[in-house]
Swiss-Prot record:
Pathway: Carbohydrate degradation; glycolysis; D-glyceraldehyde 3-phosphate and glycerone phosphate from D-glucose: step 4/4. PROSITE patterns: ALDOLASE_CLASS_II_2. One of its GO terms (molecular function) is fructose-bisphosphate aldolase activity. Belongs to the class II fructose-bisphosphate aldolase family. It catalyses: beta-D-fructose 1,6-bisphosphate = D-glyceraldehyde 3-phosphate + dihydroxyacetone phosphate. This is Fructose-bisphosphate aldolase. It comes from Ureaplasma parvum serovar 3 (strain ATCC 700970). Its EC number is 4.1.2.13. Binds 2 Zn(2+) ions per subunit. One is catalytic and the other provides a structural contribution. The active site is at 86 (proton donor). It comes from the Bacteria.
Amino acid sequence: MSPLVNAKKMIQNAYENHYAVAAININNLEWIKAALLAAQETNSPLLLATSEGAVKYMGGYDNCYAMVVNLIKQMNIKTPVCLHLDHGTYEGCIKAINAGYSSIMYDGSKLSIEENIKNTKELLTITKLKGVSVEVEVGSIGGTEDGITSEGELANIDDCYQMCLLDIDMLACGIGNIHGIYPKNWKGLNFNLLKEINNKVNKPIVLHGGSGISDEQILKAINLGVAKININTECQIAFSNALQDHLTKAGDLILSKQYDPRKILAYGVDAIKNTIIDKFTKFNSLNKIK
């Protein structure tokens, strides 16, 4: 029996009690270990997310599932853990479900709202049978590519409402947030839009691009219906800085005998874990497991 849980209960509980579940994008074994340790130490709910790119890098959906499940068992993790596909295509969602993922995000935001809803309906017929939770995106999230930062779309309120007439578990919508590092001239989240969407849909809302948003804006977003916040960039930076710092201090790796990759990567694991615990604290999700 799989130790994974779907996200429905943990996200709904967060929504009703004004905290947010951290969704940690995992990139390799070290990321999984760090996130599981952070959740166990703080008694916090945890959502592990893989992008389709990370799935390819880590050897496929079956391998990602096996790594997460086996580490949960080997590390004797008792806190609830959900394995989630982030920004999945229709085909990717099917593959993730078949591999044993307990949650999916279908990203049809680049399609017309009619086609997005149609594909979501089809996926829901499968997820209901499998007990898999569903996140759907309306209004694409911005990001930085080739040095050019896109602010992303501001989601259409009526489109959000139409999507939430379906039995989805959480809604991702563009409210001025972007993936990656926020530029200095970023305008911030559009709280008026977030408030209107929350009042209209009455569903847990997902904030993508959570890395780099101020604590004040995070808390305000949570109070306006955000119940899941995605984190990736800050963990990547923490991991890279920790390894760079350690290797710089080590100097000659042969003379200092600092060439064992397991020992080197342990510094990165600690850095990721500490970053995640900091997010749990700021999202008010500490000790939320009864």
